[in-house]
Amino acid sequence: MKILLIGYGAMNQRVARLAEEKGHEIVGVIENTPKATTPYQQYQHIADVKGADVAIDFSNPNLLFPLLDEDFHLPLVVATTGEKEKLLNKLDELSQNMPVFFSANMSYGVHALTKILAAAVPLLDDFDIELTEAHHNKKVDAPSGTLEKLYDVIVSLKENVTPVYDRHELNEKRQPQDIGIHSIRGGTIVGEHEVLFAGTDETIQITHRAQSKDIFANGAIQAAERLVNKPNGFYTFDNL
């Protein structure tokens, strides 16, 4: 499989290493600013890249959105987070002409977490719910795209939910419909997501801890391996 990388930060550097270990080939990289240290051919436009079987994106909205407006037809794996609604609308449009895969978190374990959460929410309807995520001190967006995904699962199953991001400004007791959303940034934490169900005299915690960023890179590669043989359409872990 010949792979075009969109972005060449820490994540796509891992994708490159792991993909080559699996026998795949990196045919090019698209970056905001070309760098002399990038060990692959660098491009500015997707259409300029010849022979790629799939593109894997771990970048940012500033790089990705202009590329998505170009005229190209290439299976596309997208892991960029930020401006989610705009991104999903654009990917849905592109999926009419090419296979597109999107996940805010490329870990299959996190996908499993969403399924566990979907089963737990109806069973624990009277429990308060708090969501917490922790990441390294270089992550710029908060809350994480993964936490937003977990919140979306809850919203799909509960009515009149209210997200609460900053409780210290509230001088009132917690309301039953509140969903607390908390972000922690520090050190080199790869990624931790916890769902707390707090009831009367008991609590239940569901936690996913990433121990290496390789799980996200491998998840993207595995998605790409499946996507290249798919018909046009929008794919997630649910239908890939």
Curated annotation (Swiss-Prot):
CDD domains in the cross-refs: DHDPR_N
Please state the span of the N-terminal signal peptide per the UniProt entry. none
Q: In which pathway does it act?
A: Amino-acid biosynthesis; L-lysine biosynthesis via DAP pathway; (S)-tetrahydrodipicolinate from L-aspartate: step 4/4
Entry keywords, A to Z: Amino-acid biosynthesis, Cytoplasm, Diaminopimelate biosynthesis, Lysine biosynthesis, NAD, NADP, Oxidoreductase
What's a Gene Ontology MF term here? identical protein binding
Localization, per the record, is: Cytoplasm
Q: Which terms in the GO cellular component ontology are assigned?
A: cytosol
- Residues binding (S)-2,3,4,5-tetrahydrodipicolinate: H136, G145, T146
Instruction: Give me any GO biological process, just one.
Output: diaminopimelate biosynthetic process
Catalytic site positions: H135, K139
Domain of life (superkingdom): Bacteria
Which reactions fall under this protein's catalytic activity?
(S)-2,3,4,5-tetrahydrodipicolinate + NAD(+) + H2O = (2S,4S)-4-hydroxy-2,3,4,5-tetrahydrodipicolinate + NADH + H(+); (S)-2,3,4,5-tetrahydrodipicolinate + NADP(+) + H2O = (2S,4S)-4-hydroxy-2,3,4,5-tetrahydrodipicolinate + NADPH + H(+)
Q: Where does NAD(+) bind?
A: A79, T80, T81, S103, A104, N105, M106
Name the EC number(s): 1.17.1.8
Matching PROSITE patterns? DAPB
Looking up NCBIfam families in the UniProt record yields:
dapB
Q: What does this protein do?
A: Catalyzes the conversion of 4-hydroxy-tetrahydrodipicolinate (HTPA) to tetrahydrodipicolinate.
What the record says about family reads: Belongs to the DapB family.
Q: What is the name of this protein?
A: 4-hydroxy-tetrahydrodipicolinate reductase
Q: What's the name of its gene?
A: dapB
